[in-house]
Amino acid sequence: MDVDRPGPGEELNDGAVTVPRQAATVIVLRGGAQTLEVLLVQRNPAQRFMGGAWVFPGGAVDAHEGEGDGAHRAAAVRELAEEAAIEGVDPTQLVRFSQWITPPEVKIRFDTHFFLAPLPEGAEPRVDGDECVDLGWFTPAGALAAHAAGELLLVFPTIKHFEQLSGFATADELLAFATGREVVAVTPRVVMSGEQARILLPGEPGYDTAPATS
């Protein structure tokens, strides 16, 4: 299987499409006008969902956080505090970057809104050792190289985001690009070739002709 095109890693459904749960993720940046580094946290390998994977801090929207953009921003700030001990982020200053919806073929689905946020001055990220067991700062190219070498487990959306981030030299450049930009939701599809699952993105050959799900 291609290193940059891993299978979904989760159980496929039995044909009935699950409604995705709302979620938020934060791509924390540092480097300012000098460079670009991104924070990743490692999920506890004992966890059933994406155990051992290195991910951007994030998680599902809680019911009390409401609906819509405000709920996604509230969840993003809460997850930053819970998973990386990063406090003091103004939810209104988060910059929308992307929206990814889990393929309809996968049983556990999320509609995840990705935000950019510079690391607050004085913040010292750390993990709780329970849900997340490690963290690190990575350049986009460094993260992709470590994944290709088998040193860093990345899931498909994280890989694709790092591929996009690799086109920017500094955190400031990335933030300037993303501010005010229209975000279009991306919904990959999973197609089977024998026993092997492959993920397709919109516009790729086979995406529009993938078997319909109900």
Label every PLM stretch briefly.
Residues 1-132, 136-214:
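N-terminal leader/linker segments that precede catalytic domains of diphosphate-processing enzymes
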